[in-house]
From Swiss-Prot:
PROSITE patterns: NI_HGENASE_L_1, NI_HGENASE_L_2. Pfam families: NiFeSe_Hases. SUPFAM superfamilies: HydB/Nqo4-like. Keywords: Cell membrane, Membrane, Metal-binding, Nickel, Oxidoreductase. This is Uptake hydrogenase large subunit. One of its GO terms (molecular function) is nickel cation binding. GO terms for cellular component: plasma membrane. The lineage of its organism: Bacteria, Pseudomonadati, Pseudomonadota, Alphaproteobacteria, Rhodobacterales. Its main location: membrane. Its cofactor is Ni(2+). It catalyses: H2 + A = AH2. Ni(2+) binds at C75, C78, C576, C579. Heterodimer of a large and a small subunit.
């Protein structure tokens, strides 16, 4: 049956039904079903989050100063982002300001996470959708060295011997029959287009990125004490500054500042000399693969982040842009007010929650987390062994957030789409430079590859910002400012009887918001609306589909039984299902079984 959605997509649930469950190389648990016609083109898509989030329920009645420590445990991949958003929400509610040094340190920690997350995503979660490590065994190491020197002449690891050593390591993997992290790939699928030398170069950088990621996160251990889940503080940051101290536990001294500086330099070198060149090199072989646009050229949302000055979240003060684009009008960027109940609402008509009446949308301050697991009449299978979900009923543990009634895509591509705003010429120049280097039109941005490219551009931009705030912190310290926390309102006796606030960040995956209500010194209500809630949204009461589902439509599959193309597009969002949902079914049993590896 063919239907037209209000947000402009044609769905046809006839044809062959393909089930990908679980979707791997993501954080959390996700299921995807698509219908494919006789030409191998996807005509319908259904995205299901298969875990239930209960942390909002856990937070009720707790001390708001502790909320960051709970919300941070939502996810270990985007570690720290939920904590930062949480302390901002509580500070917003209680009118707490933070010192300039705390703002710089928070920004550096968030920027460090952006860089780390984007590198891990590109090489370890997404690259294998485009790169064939088995094909790398056919490469000529000398030709690979020449390719590396042409793509990135500044990267020092480029000799034929270096690539030959990596190739020999790969050969041992393959000959042993134990492919490990390369197991279960569709390596003979014609969707893979790279020549062997490009495959060897990219696989080598995959291994280099593994080594880099353990160094990058040391910034979090320096300022936050550990990683994952560094420590945070309502009112600032928990690390005192003692530049003359040597080895002082927990204090920031010159030794630690020098280490931070060296990590920033290493991140910058890798991003500029490996990550961005690899993106261009790999993308150059897939320039015609412009599927996966979905909502990206139509409706996008960015909260913005990285305030230049503490306590000022006005759009003009944010280094990462804020704004919303709807109806495909890239020339009009709407401002975003997350406190406005007319702007942000969540719907649950197709989610396993209950709001009491159909079609009701709730602003997060009034949001509810009341599970209601029920399956539709057209389900194929059983409650614990679902063959095909019924998308006409409830089918996901993810809610359906909407901005002024519109399904929105969030993430680095959404932020990139907002650069028509005055004050972000540096981002605009990045985008124009990439398109010029790859000889692509602006329309190419609104695709799976464009989404992936936006992450790389954001990583490079964040490297520059991290250096900016490091220099700002050092200058403040030299001028005698060592303040890192404001504890004037730490005591609950200074708080109002009732208060509410909102915290926002631009997480690596996109717009993240926490809304809190405080009463008598305790959390009365707490709601998180996370990037994958926006992107992984099921249908709403009007039939609008979310970003995941929209992005898969009209994609041509080489072999429907080997869903390389589905994984490419879903991975381009870097889904984090643990952030958007938590815990399995009430019985603790898996809801589905694997249909396609």
């Amino acid at each position: 049956m063919t239907t037209q959605t209000p947000n402009g997509f044609t769905l046809d649930n006839a044809g062959k039904r393909i089930v990908v469950d679980p979707v791997t190389r993501i954080e959390g648990h996700m299921r995807c079903e698509v219908n494919v016609n006789d030409q191998g083109i996807i005509t319908n898509a259904v995205s299901t989050g298969t875990m239930w989030r209960g942390l909002e329920v856990i937070l009720k009645g707790r001390d708001p100063r502790d909320a960051w420590a709970f919300t941070e445990r939502i996810c270990g991949v985007c570690t720290g982002t939920h904590a930062l958003t949480s302390v901002r929400a509580v500070e917003s509610a209680l009118g707490i300001t933070i010192p300039d040094n705390a703002n710089s340190i928070r920004n550096m920690m968030q920027l460090n996470l952006q860089i780390h997350d984007h590198i891990v995503h590109f090489y370890h979660l997404h690259a294998l959708d485009w790169v064939n490590p088995v094909n790398a065994l056919r490469a000529d190491p000398k030709a690979t060295s020449e390719l590396q020197q042409m793509v990135s002449p500044s990267h020092p690891l480029s000799s034929p011997g270096y690539f030959r050593d990596v190739q020999n390591r790969l050969k041992k993997f393959v000959e042993s029959g134990q492919l490990g992290l390369f197991k279960n790939g569709y390596w003979d699928n014609p969707a893979y287009k790279l020549p062997p030398e490009a495959d060897l170069m990219a696989t080598t950088h995959y291994l280099e990125a593994l080594d880099l990621q353990k160094e990058v996160v040391k910034v979090h251990t320096i300022f936050g004490g550990k990683n994952p889940h560094p420590n945070w503080l309502v009112g600032g940051v928990p690390c005192p500054i003692n530049v003359d101290g040597v080895g002082a536990v927990g204090a920031i001294n010159m030794e630690r500042l020098n280490l931070v500086s060296s990590i920033i330099d290493r991140c910058t070198e890798f991003t500029r000399n490996v990550y961005l060149p690899d993106l261009k090199a790999i993308g150059g072989f897939y320039k015609e693969w412009l599927y996966g646009g979905g909502l990206s050229g139509q409706s996008v949302l960015s909260y913005g982040d990285i305030p230049e000055n503490p306590n000022d979240f006005s759009a003009g003060q944010l280094h990462l842009p804020r704004g919303a684009i709807i109806n495909g009008n890239l020339n009009e960027v709407h401002d975003v007010d997350t406190t406005d109940p007319e702007q942000v609402q969540e719907f649950v008509d197709h989610s396993w929650y209950d709001y009491g009446e159909p079609g009701m949308g709730l602003h997060p301050w009034d949001g509810r987390t009341e599970p209601k697991f029920e399956l539709g009449p057209n389900l194929k299978g059983t409650r614990t062994n679902i063959e095909n979900i019924d998308e006409g009923a409830k089918y996901s543990w993810i809610k359906a957030p909407r901005w002024r009634g519109n399904a929105m895509e969030v993430g680095p591509l959404a932020a990139t789409s907002s650069v028509t705003r005055k004050g972000h010429e540096d981002i605009k120049n990045q985008v124009e430079g990439l398109l010029r280097d790859m000889n692509l039109p602006v329309s190419a941005l609104f695709s799976t590859l464009g989404r992936t490219a936006a992450r790389a551009l954001e990583a490079e931009y964040c490297c520059r910002l991290q250096k900016h705030f490091f220099d700002k912190l050092v200058t403040n310290i030299k001028n005698g400012d060592s303040s890192t926390a404001n504890v004037e309102k730490w005591d609950p006796s200074t708080w109002p009887k009732e208060a509410k606030g909102v915290g926002m960040t631009e997480a690596p995956r996109g717009a993240l918001g926490h809304w809190v209500k405080i009463k008598d010194g305790r959390i009365e209500n707490y709601q998180c609306v996370v990037p994958t809630t926006w992107n992984g949204s099921p249908r709403d009461s009007k039939g609008n589909i979310g970003a995941f589902e929209a992005s898969l439509l009209n994609t041509k599959m080489e072999r429907p039984e080997e869903p390389v193309e589905i994984l490419r597009t879903l991975h381009s969002f870097d889904p984090c299902l643990a952030c958007s949902t938590h815990v399995m079914s009430a019985e603790g049993a898996p809801l589905t079984t694997v249909k396609v590896r």
